[in-house]
């Protein structure tokens, strides 16, 4: 995998453009999987050797997260988790995909620093949560 193909700054691109710029055949993680739609794009365009899908799939009553469109009721969260598990069952059995039902801060503790070639951060969308994800999954 070569990071020299990835521009230093990517501005005003949609994630559908971004995914085509990410390194291929590496070890990657998606933080905040929701229904798994972008996970499919990651597999298609980035073709990672290993993709870790990390999401708590749990409704949160935090005031700062209540308005988020992916903070759906608990039964819908369970349905999303089951759907993602079914959607990627083949890749899980082949060892290409691992599904982690956990909060990102908890999941990060299970990986050594520098394990990932890249991480797509799209879990909780608050400043503090994104900063924590960047800190927890940083290779440094």
Label the model's feature ranges.
Residues 2-9, 15-140:
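S-adenosylmethionine/decaboxylated-SAM
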